[in-house]
Amino acid sequence: MVGDVHGHFKLLTAALDKLNFNTELDRIFSVGDLIDRGPESIDILNWLEKPWFHAVRGNHEQMLIDCISGHGDIPRHIRNGGAWLYELQPDIQQELSKTLQALPLIIEIELSNDHTIGIVHAEAPVIQSNDGWQEAKDAITGKSGEQHQRQALKTALYAREKIDQQDHTTIKGIDRIYVGHSTVPSVTRLGNVVYIDTGCAFSDGALSLVDIQTETMISISMSP
């Protein structure tokens, strides 16, 4: 599991080399925000073609989709590291948008030890305080109605309430949930939610990866 890459795919490659990542046996999952701020955002197209690489959609992917569709705030996107997009030909922009629209908002993984792992970019989209993982999935897929779906989308992509409140409440119906979005100085756990964006978009940050079987982790610093 890798935190927000933000266009630093060479750094991700270095991390996988360090881990002796085997493309025949291993899989890598991403909490989203693969693009913007870093120098290799366009490489996302190549990475998403790899059969062993799986990602959820982050808010930066959503910003790209919105801007290309004509419903986004392009100046805001540029301020947040999206200038690279507008240097591309329109057909490449459309290809990127189409590819990113296909990314799921939630991924669920069954491990060999019968544990279930969830992945979402910002926060599990629980709408009501007693909701669990199943209710979050129902909300994001529209089974709980259009209003709940809109709220769930916003929560999944942008929310920071749990970490802002240092809420250690366990989300029922799932063993662990991995999220990014909120930058933390080191991999941080609140209840059964694990925050793994350690800020590789910033000069004093790092890219962190967690083995979801063993819960061991490595971080590669952005500073020399």
What are these regions, as identified by a protein language model?
Residues 41-109, 113-117, 141-150:
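Active-site neighborhood of divalent metal-dependent phosphoester bond hydrolases
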